[in-house]
Amino acid sequence: MPNLNPYLTFNGNCREAMTFYKECLGGELSLMVVGESPVADQMPPQFKDQILHSSLKTKDMEFMGSDMQPEKLLDGNAVHLCLTCNTEEETRSLYDKLAEGGKARQPVHEMFFGLIGALTDKFGKQWMVVCNKP
């Protein structure tokens, strides 16, 4: 089965966002700056310090991101990043870290299937943090 990896777009703050996610989730972060990339001469000069491509890899997941020209970026609520945790402690800890500076839309609480919490992080990305019952 193929892997499904989220690719996030940002309005000039990809480096800050991906660094924040690394602090929350751990893993290895790689960043490619527009001005140091093979396509640098094809990009407008004002984008030279923006992120062309980034990747955050942990043992269990990988997600990527880049900056986008502000006039082309569309924010919406049709997609959530869902973290499935192994314990209640991990669920609450990751929820608290990701919610820092953002908006806690639904605190972690118990449902028939386990725990769930929903938040919008300080970069406008929507997350669900869950822990299923065994």
Predicted regions and their residues:
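Glyoxalase I/VOC metalloenzyme domain signal
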Residues: 1-110, 118-134
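Substrate-binding/gating loop at the entrance of the active-site cleft, primarily
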Residues: 113
